């Protein structure tokens, strides 16, 4: 496999799982490129732009959280998050068979307890299979209005959507406030994370699924906590 050297700050993020993160980087730089999951020009910035950017979400989750990564693609942000935070439970949701095969190969090779589910987050069958989640993550999957609709559908009451976004995050929130509200998303805000090892830090849109007391919620569905 191609060796992709991590930056010096990476050990603080992954700890004793750094060798697994390095192996994942090699997967991305080889099979990921060959299968069209990562662009060939991305190999020189796999760590900063992809792996560390994804792992930064580890600052925003809690121990024991059940996390669904929707439209996982090459495993971003789900796999780096699982490596940085072995105390959470990650499920990768991806509709394309060839991508699911790649994800399964990576998960098996790394020996991590990550579940791969083929399907779309909005599919009732997927929702039944994965149940209600504490957190839903996403990266480069779709517009904020679509992400909110997909995410709220598999979140428990008060569960959180964490969507990695770019410089237009604030503007995207303003443009979609009505749709976000209809989807049951409340407390929508922009967070920055990974400032100790990313320049600029990762930009994340956080939203909570409404409960009957603060918004729409879903009548008849109970929260986990």
Swiss-Prot record:
Pfam (any one): GidB
Domain of life: Bacteria
Family note: Belongs to the methyltransferase superfamily. RNA methyltransferase RsmG family.
GO cellular component, one term: cytosol
Stated name of the protein: Ribosomal RNA small subunit methyltransferase G
Uppermost EC category: transferase
Keywords associated with the record: Cytoplasm, Methyltransferase, rRNA processing, S-adenosyl-L-methionine, Transferase
GO MF terms held by the record: rRNA (guanine-N7-)-methyltransferase activity
Record SUPFAM superfamilies: S-adenosyl-L-methionine-dependent methyltransferases
InterPro entries xrefs: rRNA_ssu_MeTfrase_G, SAM-dependent_MTases_sf
Enzyme nomenclature, EC number: 2.1.1.-
Record PANTHER family: S-ADENOSYL-L-METHIONINE-DEPENDENT METHYLTRANSFERASES SUPERFAMILY PROTEIN
Subcellular location: Cytoplasm
Segments of this protein annotated with the region Disordered: 204-225
Binding site for S-adenosyl-L-methionine: 71, 76, 121-122, 139
Gene that this sequence comes from: rsmG
Main localisation: cytoplasm
Function per UniProt: Specifically methylates the N7 position of guanine in position 518 of 16S rRNA.
